[in-house]
Amino acid sequence: MKKFAILACLLLAGCSAKKSNVAVGGLCESKYVEQTAQTIADEGLGTYNVLFRKGPWNPDMLKKVIKVCRENGMTFTMDEVMDRQNHGPYQIYQDSLTQIIEVLQKNADIMDGTLVLGEFGGVNFAWPVTSARKGTASMPAVSTYSQADAWIRNRVKTQTDYADSLGLPRPYISIGPEFGAYSHLLRSGIDRIDVEMCFGEETERRYASVIGASKAFGKERFGVDNAMLWYGGEQQDELWFQRYRTSWYHAYLRGANPIYAEHGVTNYNAYIKRLDTDDPLVVRFRKELGDFASWVAKNPRPEGLPRAAVAFMQGRMDGYVGSWQTHKWGQRLNEDFRIGGDERAWKIVDQCYEREGWNSRDVNGEIELSGNPPLGTVNVIPYDIPSEELAQYKVVIFLGYNAMDDELYAKLVNYVSEGGVILMAARHLDTADSPLQNFTAYNGGDWTELTGLKALDGRRRMKFGVKFTANPSCGWKFHQYGTACDPWFTDGGFMMPEFENHGADTLAVGAEVMWEKKFSTDECLLFEHKIGKGSVIFCPSISPVGSPELYPLYLYLVRRALEGVDVYPKVECTDGVRWSCYEDGTVLLLNTEYHVGQEVIVHQSPTKSRKIKLSPGELKVIR
C-alpha cells in the first residue's frame, strides 16, 4: 500500500526561520536509564523527556539523564514519586527520596515540572474495581455529591501541599484521559494537565475540556501524552500509521505543548506484542516521531490556546469524568450512583464534530458549516469559571448534572445581561445532593430572574410532539411550518413541573395533531427570556438531557445554537477536516483523510474568502 505521509505547508514567508515554541519528545522508562534520552537526542526526536517508572529512579540514574539533557539542550519532567492512592511516597522511594529531590532542585533550570496524581480520573472515578490496585479505589463510600466533591478537593490539595513540603519542583503535572477530571485537578492545586490521549469518540471532548479548564483557571498551556501506541489499535498497518501521524498534528492544531510519545521510543510493550529497540516497527515509530519533531522545529505556532465561541458548562457536583466510568463519583459498589441520562448527555459534545447529512432538513443558512463548531472547536468549562473568562464565550450550554447555588445563578444572570446566550433545562436548576433525592428546585422554583418562569409543585409528563412557533432573538433558526404541520419529536415524554410564566417568550408548544387553526397554549415547551443584551433559551424539562425522551430535541437545539453563532473566520469543509483559530488570526487546517484530498473555503469576513486545497493528511497554517 502506498505510504501517505503527513504533509505540512506554512503560508507565511520566513516563519520557518523562527525557533519553535512547542516541545516534542518521548517517555523515558527507568529501566533504560539515559538510553531513551540519548536516542531522542541522536535521532532528532525532539528535546523533551518525561521520566517514567519501570522500577525506581535513583540519584545516579537521574544524573545520567540530566547529563544527556544538558549536553543536548533538552528538558525533562520527573516521574511520580508519591503514591496515587495513599498519602506519602511510594515504598520504593522511601530511602532515596531526599537525595532525589536534592538532584532535582539543583537542576530545576532544565526541569519542566513533576508528575503528581497520574490517572486521577481513572483511579478515583472511572476504573472498574478489578483495575485498581488490590481491588480497591481511592474514593471512599459516600452518600452525597458534596461529600465526594469535598473528598476530591482535599485529596488533590493534600497531595500537592505534601509535594510542596518535600520541595518537589513545580509545576505539578497530572496525566490522564478522563475529560471531566481536569477541572477537579486544576481547581485544587495541580498546575498543568497533560492529556493521555486515548483514541476514540472522546478525543475532541478531551481537548475541549482541557482547553476550557486551563483557560478558566489561568493556566497557559496543557500537554499531550500521545498514547496512540496503546489505544490506537493493535494492528500496525498503513491505516494505523496514518492515525499515528494524524494524532501528532492534531495535538499541535489543538494547542498542546509539550507533545510526547507515551511509548515506542525505545520499545513497544502493548497488548500481545513485545518489541525491542531495533525492531522495524519500533524504528518506524521513531521515524514518525522524528518527522513530526523536525516539522515542529521549523514551524512555530501562535502563542496561547485556540479560540472558542461556544462552551459547555460542567456543572456543580457533576461527578462524571468519562472513559470507562460506570458510577458517579467513583461509587462503584453503590448502584444508586450508577450513571444515567445526565452523564450520557455529554455525547452531544462529540456530535458537534459530526457533519449533518446532505439529506438533513435541519441545516440552514447560505453555507454548510456543520461538522465543525464555530472557530473549529468548543470548550468544556467549569462552573466556577471567573466571570471575565465566561464573557469570552458567545453561547454557554448546560448538558450534565448541575446543582445550582446562589453564586452560579448570579453569575449566569450577569453573563446574559452583558450579551451572552444560555441554553439550559429545568434539570439544571436542581439542588439535589444525592441520587436518592428527587428533583429539588433551586430557590423554591422561583427562576423568574434567569428564565422568566416560576416552577410550581405539580409535575406532569409532556404528552405530545413539538411545534416551533417562533425563532429566538439570538439568531437561531427553527423549523416553522405554521400550525398545520406534523409535530416533531413525537417520541418525547419528558417530565416537567407546572409553572407560571412571568415574561418569557414561547418558542415551541406541544402538539398531537397535524391540522390546527392555532397553536395550543396548553403545553409550552421552549422559551426565550431576554435579560439586558442577551437571552436564555429554556426547556422546562426536569428529565436529564441524555434521557431518550429529551436527547433528540436538545441535540437539535444545540445544533441550531452552533449554526446561529456568527463569528469569523468560518471554514466550509467536511468533518474530515479539523481546524483551529488563534487570537492572532492564524487558522490551522488538518485533513484527517487517509487517501482523499479536500478543498475547503476559508471565509475571513462576509466579503472575503479563499479556497484552500489540502492533500491527504496535510496540515496547513494560514496567517
Predicted segments, located by residue:
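A glycine-rich, often tryptophan-bearing local segment used as a flexible ligand/cofactor-contacting loop or short
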Residues: 402-492
